[in-house]
Amino acid sequence: MKKIAVLTSGGDAPGMNAAVRAVVRYGIKNGLEVIGVRRGYSGLIDGDFVKLEYKDVAGITEKGGTILRTSRCEEFKTEEGREAAAKQLKKHGIEGLVVIGGEGSLTGAHLLHEEHNIPVVGIPATIDNDIGLTDMCIGVDTCLNTVMDAIQKLKDTASSHERAFIVEVMGRHSGYIALMAGLVTGAEAIIIPEIPVDYSQLADRILQERRRGKINSIIVVAEGAASAYTVARHLEYRIGYETRITILGHVQRGGSPTAFDRRLALSMGVEAVEALLDGEADVMIALQGNKFVRVPIMEALSTKKTIDKKLYEIAHLLS
């Protein structure tokens, strides 16, 4: 193997740049030519390639986002789109591909290998932390710290004004960020897709706490469970006073990655290159315990990552 490519796809996650840096520099150290694919799978189809040298990735570990840019590519979901991508790889003599992204990106990588025998290795990068067989995905720790910091600031104003704040965080199918952020900030309630919410019971809890002298409340809701406005409507009707809504939105994706995310991304990038050099394909790099391992992409994607209900109960008890 003499030439490989790397791309970032789907929603950006803090730490993607660190992974790109590791792939580029470790690849070059092992005698490989490394090509960067701009704009994810869209760039792969269009042939938007750039040769990456050692100096091109200097100083990017601490930067959020992705220097390669990213996209969500509908065309790549079609057989014709994947065929066009495979032709571009073969045209440019690229013998292996590292894909950094979430569930959709990794599914695309698997199909590219299955249909066109392209050696691919996936690196899980998504703030939802919803990829199976890996303890953590790149970007999760940074996102969690961003959310925690925002909630702590909201608690200051909630206390000053004696208000209930509803904080909506990302998580279309997974409540991981909401659960962990709610736990570490002492939120009065956490609403996640995995566990049904009883608004009457929730309102009773808030009113009970208020009678005990708790003058402010923080309710953390994952976007996939309900919108903050829906939660506010249900609660205001039952508790009899106005709430305030904060939707954190895309701020959760940005920012300089934490030390944990940098280390995770750098290690996964190195392992991805080693996997290609070892002749492996259609695998994802995963963190299991304190070890980095290679697992089949579809096995990871078909393994449902469940919420730790004990943590949910602990968060409820400690609120």
UniProtKB/Swiss-Prot annotation:
Residues that hold ATP according to the record: G11, R72, C73, G102, E103, G104, S105
Record's GO cellular component terms: 6-phosphofructokinase complex
Compartment list: Cytoplasm
Residues that, per the record, bind Mg(2+): E103
Names of required cofactors: Mg(2+)
Chain positions recorded as substrate binding sites: T126, I127, D128, R163, M170, G171, R172, E223, R244, H250, V251, Q252, R253
Binding sites annotated in the UniProt record for ADP: R21, A22, V23, V24, R25, K155, G186, A187, E188, R212, K214, I215, N216
PROSITE patterns for this protein: PHOSPHOFRUCTOKINASE
Catalytic activity: beta-D-fructose 6-phosphate + ATP = beta-D-fructose 1,6-bisphosphate + ADP + H(+)
Regulation (activators, inhibitors): Allosterically activated by ADP and other diphosphonucleosides, and allosterically inhibited by phosphoenolpyruvate.
UniProt GO BP: canonical glycolysis; fructose 1,6-bisphosphate metabolic process; fructose 6-phosphate metabolic process
Subunit-level organization: Homotetramer.
Protein name, as recorded: ATP-dependent 6-phosphofructokinase
Source species: Thermotoga neapolitana (strain ATCC 49049 / DSM 4359 / NBRC 107923 / NS-E)
